[in-house]
Amino acid sequence: MKILETERLLLRGLEQGDFKDVCKLLQDDEVMYAYEGAFNDQEVQNWLDRQFGRYRHDGFGLWGGGEKGSNELIGQCGITYQEFDGKRVPEIGYLFKKEFWHKGFAIEAAVACREYAFHTLGFEEVYSIIRDTNIASQKVARRNGMQKVATFIKHYRGV
């Protein structure tokens, strides 16, 4: 089901049939360095299950992104609730296959998600939680109108 459309992308809800394509994304060490390493098959399934739960409970989550005119899943972008400063906040997250890095897909998707968060979901503020070493993602966030509000440590895998 299509959620958002941009000039070059379609963002849609993920389905179980996307498992192999999601594996190509989440099992790439270079793509997943900000998450402290690539996922194994079970971790990919757990990640998918979390998205399905988010769709049901929140009405949104991380969506699959594909180029218009192609069925290939090139990344994911969307809105999830994350814990920050003792509260639950909406976060815009994005992750794309490395062959699609530095081509403007992340900012295109992130801007669409920001607009959706404000105008469709009615949020008054959104966040992007980004690893301090992920300079490219920080640049995307700044181009998306984000401002740094805090620095903190978040562990994804106990590292």
Specify the residue positions occupied by each region the protein language model found.
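Conserved GNAT-fold acetyl-CoA-binding loop/helix
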Residues: 30-50
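Sparse recognition of residues in long alpha-helices and their boundaries
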Residues: 38-39, 60, 87, 157
